[in-house]
């Protein structure tokens, strides 16, 4: 069984990780965020599998709840920022596909134009 002090320390570490991930999302450091997300998920899994001792008093329980609430608030903010980033990337992909289509159409037109500019077989004999 884990001590109340150790449990509080683990919850505070989880909060620290969630704050770090939120900061990374705000600053657009997506690669680093993904790396930290792995550590974060492992920390959450560790806490999920850690039973809360019965001898923890109501003040400590309240403190743990407050920490968890802040962690969940941070997760909601990160989720919003990730959705915004996904929308941006989706827009960029759409623009890229349009540009590719335009380039392909232009290439076809340019190829046909060259054929139109080629001299006719009768014109080469004169």
UniProtKB/Swiss-Prot annotation:
Lineage of the species this protein comes from: Bacteria, Pseudomonadati, Pseudomonadota, Gammaproteobacteria, Enterobacterales
Region annotation (FliD binding) ranges: 60-98
GO cellular component: cytosol
Region (Required for homodimerization): 1-50
Gene expressing this chain: fliT
Keyword Repressor: yes
Chief subcellular location: cytoplasm
Stored HAMAP family: FliT (MF_01180)
Keyword Transcription regulation: yes
Taxonomic superkingdom: Bacteria
Protein name per Swiss-Prot or TrEMBL: Flagellar protein FliT
Listed InterPro entries: FliT (IPR008622)
Entry's Gene Ontology BP terms: bacterial-type flagellum organization; negative regulation of bacterial-type flagellum assembly; protein folding
Subcellular location: Cytoplasm, Cytosol
Family: Belongs to the FliT family.
Organism (species): Pectobacterium atrosepticum (strain SCRI 1043 / ATCC BAA-672) (Erwinia carotovora subsp. atroseptica)
UniProtKB keywords: Bacterial flagellum biogenesis, Chaperone, Cytoplasm, Repressor, Transcription, Transcription regulation
Function: Dual-function protein that regulates the transcription of class 2 flagellar operons and that also acts as an export chaperone for the filament-capping protein FliD. As a transcriptional regulator, acts as an anti-FlhDC factor; it directly binds FlhC, thus inhibiting the binding of the FlhC/FlhD complex to class 2 promoters, resulting in decreased expression of class 2 flagellar operons. As a chaperone, effects FliD transition to the membrane by preventing its premature polymerization, and by directing it to the export apparatus.
Record note on quaternary structure: Homodimer. Interacts with FliD and FlhC.
